[in-house]
Curated annotation (Swiss-Prot):
Compartments (UniProt record): Cellular thylakoid membrane
Protein name (database record): NAD(P)H-quinone oxidoreductase subunit 2
Function: NDH-1 shuttles electrons from an unknown electron donor, via FMN and iron-sulfur (Fe-S) centers, to quinones in the respiratory and/or the photosynthetic chain. The immediate electron acceptor for the enzyme in this species is believed to be plastoquinone. Couples the redox reaction to proton translocation, and thus conserves the redox energy in a proton gradient. Cyanobacterial NDH-1 also plays a role in inorganic carbon-concentration.
Gene: ndhB
InterPro entries recorded: NADH-Q_OxRdtase_suN/2 (IPR010096), ND/Mrp_TM (IPR001750)
């Protein structure tokens, strides 16, 4: 037995990107112990080095995947690499836009960075987890760090309320996942997702269907799909804005990665059932998310409901289940990273200078801060799907893939709700560019002079310029990005097996 233990090949190189993130966590905690002044100086550099090294190692793994690691509990295939890269990039941008906000709020920077990196670690591990136990550990690592981040402004009652709500709903979602997992283990005698899928093929039963519903409920909570979205607006409104920016992209991306993996492996024999449930979730998310966003007066609440609608669009690609559909879903999540975090960069800048989050307070902003106005306008137009922005091409790929797979209802609902979303996005833009000075809000009239030299603002500026540039140059970037997304799907064996099986049935 001891000899067998030493001959086990764990293929630990699969998690080298996560190892760099872990080193970053240790580094930020150590500088935090040295005092706030030392942490403020060194924590950002440690984070950049950690995330940069992680992204570099992911690049080196691309097309050289480690298919099975840690006795089959983790796969570093191309799909996992793509999702982990999106999460790492979202963390990098979220940190760039958070330094000034964290410093101004009087919160410890080293501690904040360590928790953000911990959430990133959990999210990245979730993307490649192929075992019920590793999924749960990754899920809880992400969730616990997210609860801490939501309540990070300890002296703000809204932040504490957001953390408590998130904790209660998240704990319920974790319990539901464990209950569903216990059914799957009882039916198959295994915790490996692929093995479970093979064992339950010939065991269609009420218990299996119940397990599917429970697991799908956890997925829906993670991606904030209706009707599991109730936590989203309150948590987004009460949490620190940089935290909201990270959760809206990083957490959602991890949720979709988990959804694709478990639905395509464990529940591949229940293809019609989960696609029907996902279709219902997508329609409800697109409709409710975009309609309720019309009535919002808070910018963060509006973006919260917008993110619910955006999740519905991504689900179109997953429901189609084709090569183009899954590639379009990956592409849209990459596009969503830049256009959503670009919008949040502008919201954070406005909040830092005015302390306000009300949409009405943006009236006349063009006269005092043309940069925020231009950046926010471009990102909102991209979220609405207007050409020639990156979001337009992302939606086009999704709608074409859905239509080709005969998902006509989903595509029609997607088109209608996209038009609805354009209305509330353009309403914000119209408000910012009012012509008459007297129409400007009182907040804008007393708007401070723009000074980019303040500590913490140069990184935010870099993030803003980068996100807006990528969003605006969508026409040039969409094709190479789609090719990368297509490679992520075509070079992932379990997805090719599922796509081939679906083609044979059709």
């Amino acid at each position: 037995m001891p000899n067998e233990i030493f001959t086990i090949n764990l293929n630990a190189q699969a998690i080298i990107p996560e190892a760099f993130i872990l080193l970053g966590i240790v580094g930020t905690l150590l500088v935090d112990l040295a005092g706030e002044k030392t942490a403020s100086k060194w924590a950002p550099s440690i984070c950049y080095l950690s995330i940069g090294s992680s992204l570099l190692s992911l690049t080196l793994q691309w097309n050289n995947p480690v298919e099975s690691a840690f006795l089959g509990s983790f796969n570093s295939d191309n799909l996992a690499i793509a999702f982990r890269a999106i999460i790492a990039l979202s963390t990098l941008v979220s940190l760039l836009i958070s330094w000034r906000y964290t410093e101004q709020s009087g919160s410890p920077i080293g501690e904040f960075a360590a928790i953000v990196l911990s959430a990133t670690l959990g999210a990245m591990l979730l993307c490649g987890s192929t075992d019920l136990i590793s999924v749960f550990i990754s899920l809880e690592t992400l969730s616990v760090a997210s609860y801490l981040l939501s309540g990070y402004l300890k002296r703000d009652p809204r932040s504490s309320e957001a953390a408590l709500k998130y904790l209660l709903v998240g704990s319920a979602a974790a319990a539901v996942y464990l209950y569903g997992s216990s059914f799957l283990y009882g039916l198959s005698g295994s915790t490996n997702l692929t093995t479970i899928g093979l064992e339950i093929i010939n065991k269609p039963s009420f218990i299996t269907s119940l397990a599917l519903v429970f697991v799908l409920s956890t997925v829906a909570f993670k991606i904030a799909a209706v009707p599991f979205h109730q936590w989203t607006p309150d948590v987004y409104e009460g949490s620190p804005t940089p935290v909201v920016a990270f959760l809206s992209v990083g957490s959602k991306t991890a949720g979709f990665a988990f959804a694709i993996r478990i639905l395509s492996t464990t529940f591949s024999s229940f293809d019609e059932e989960w696609k029907l449930l996902f279709t219902i979730l997508a329609i409800l998310s697109m409709a409710l998310g975009n309609v309720v966003a019309l009535a919002q007066t808070s910018m963060k609440r509006m973006l919260a409901y917008s993110s619910i609608g955006q999740a519905g669009f991504v689900m179109i690609g997953i429901v189609s289940g084709t090569q183009d559909g899954l590639s379009a879903a990956v592409l849209y999540l990459a596009a969503y990273l830049f256009m959503n975090l670009g919008a949040f960069s502008c919201v954070i800048l406005f909040s830092l200078r005015t302390g306000s989050d009300r949409i009405l307070d943006y009236s006349g902003l063009y006269q005092k801060d043309p940069l925020i106005t231009l950046g926010l306008s471009l990102c909102l137009l991209s979220l609405g799907g207007l050409p020639p922005m990156l979001g337009f091409f992302g939606k086009i790929y999704l709608f074409f893939a859905g239509w080709a797979n005969h998902q006509y209802l989903l595509v029609i609902v997607g088109l209608v709700t996209s038009v609805i979303s354009i209305y509330y996005y353009i309403s914000v833009i119209k408000m910012m560019v009012v012509k008459e000075p007297q129409e400007a809000s009182e907040i804008v009239k007393s708007y401070p002079e723009v000074n980019w030299g303040i500590a913490g603002l140069p990184p935010l500026r870099v993030a803003l310029y980068t996100c807006v540039a990528v969003t605006a140059l969508g026409g040039i970037l969409s094709n190479p990005l789609f090719k990368l997304a297509n490679t992520a799907v075509s070079e992932t064996p379990f997805l090719q097996d599922v796509i081939a099986a679906a083609n044979n049935i059709s």
